Amino acid sequence: MKKFIFFFKNYCYISGSMLLFSLIDLLLWIISLYCVGLVFWILFALQCVYFVWWLWKNIFYQLNAFRLVNFVWDNPLSVIIGKLGTGKTLLLTYLSQTMKLLTDEIYSNYPLEDDKVKVLTFKNLDFTDRTKPVPPDDSVILFDESYLYIDGTSPHDEKKVHSGKIPWIVLARHFRHRALFTAQREGMIWNNIRQLASGIIIPISLKKPVAKKGFNFFNRFFIMRMGIFQDITDYEIWKTKSVERTAEGKRAKHKSDVGLGIRFFKIIIPLEFANKYDSEWLKFVRDLKNDEIVNEKFYYWSEITKLSVKERLELFDIDILKKNLKPRKEKGNGKDD
């Protein structure tokens, strides 16, 4: 029943965006009623072509949605790698809704406007911690901005601090967990997670709905093109070749290889999913810092000339200059004097 509701909801979403084309098809049908001979058959053929295209596009997006859901479900550890603005958090939010087809245990480390999604922190996955429980079987764990928790560029230092997470990383399959971690670069993800991840998801492009005032019926979904890999090595090879082709002025290849577990496809993400999260929810951290500042004044550059050289140096807070420009001790202060 859940799959039927999910299919029907997305099907209607696409159909609504194609209402304009349906009106055009209706217009062609009305015109064909007043035509005979060759003109009639041409209009009839256009209607048939449009209907086949419309039906294929609906089924195409639905199959891709199920392909992504099954891919995540089959991989205990997955990473989402993409530059800023490619829709990593949007994709996590989309999965927070679509993975409900298979489980009710959804956890995230960022706020979602969903009563069925539970709060999760890194301590839930730490076996040296005795304050927060590990999620139960068939849990989907959505972990955004993983670099804020573990510095992937310093794996040896982090291993000492986060050694309690290693048992969970290794045993995630035994716990029947499905976890996804996001980062802008693969090197930002902790090596222990990156090397054991059997699912690599790469958002390639994101077509956003066009913001319009008033009635906005035809632009209510995102279209995301992505690639999925089952091995980090395959992804790195594809990335290297893509960079080489781009440097030569060629387009990067997005060719699927089922044998290697490499697929490229598009999904649609309803606008209502994007409204379930705030992409700037961590801005409260700025307030924590500013609350402890005594002098909150900001200077204009036109005011700098009114300050003394010493005040400017203190204001700019350039440590190297402050260290090397310390006043020397005056002569004559030695013991001989």
Curated annotation (Swiss-Prot):
| Principal localisation | host cell
Q: Which residues cross the membrane?
A: 4-24, 26-46
Gene3D superfamilies in the record, alphabetically?
P-loop containing nucleotide triphosphate hydrolases (3.40.50.300)
Task: One GO cellular component term, please give it.
Answer: membrane
Q: Where in the cell is it found?
A: Host membrane
Query: Does this UniProt record's set of keywords contain Transmembrane?
Result: yes
UniProt keywords (A-Z) are: Host membrane, Membrane, Transmembrane, Transmembrane helix
Membrane topology, record value: Multi-pass membrane protein
Xref: InterPro entries: P-loop_NTPase
Q: Which family does it belong to?
A: Belongs to the plectrovirus ORF2 family.
> This protein is called what?
Uncharacterized protein ORF2
What phylogenetic lineage does the species belong to?
Viruses, Monodnaviria, Loebvirae, Hofneiviricota, Faserviricetes
